[in-house]
Amino acid sequence: MNSTRNHPALPDGWTKGAVMALLSEIAPHIGLRPARLAVLIYIIGRTRASDWTSPNREPVFFGAQDFAAVELGKTARQLRTDEAALARLGLIVKRVTANGARYGRAGLGLILTPLIARLEEFIALRDRLRAERKHLRALTGR
């Protein structure tokens, strides 16, 4: 985690828990299927809370892929596929060594700053979806 560069950080009042709740609400609308949402929530949950709010740090998941796969009830290959899909969706960046190793001290692993950078977009989507649901309830009298 490089401490000399500025990175996107969560706005005041936001926590990684709030980000997880937001993602759960909008997941289908950003192409995030339930199994991949579970992987993303797992990854987020294993980062330091302070890394989400400091512009001098990046939230990085550097846990071993094999161990994470076991905890998620997946094979390592399935988890690699999920990680690649999360990267294609612009939610993470994989920064690993040539052999795929991840190291916390070196800031190598699954980087979550792209997710933070898109937070405003996701909040706007959530607000739009809530407004649409409210409008539909008004139309149906519910």
Where are these predicted regions, by residue range?
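Short recognition helix of helix-turn-helix/winged-helix DNA-binding domains
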Residues: 1-60
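Short, low-complexity, polar/charged sequence segments that are solvent-exposed and flexible
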Residues: 59, 98, 113-114, 128-132
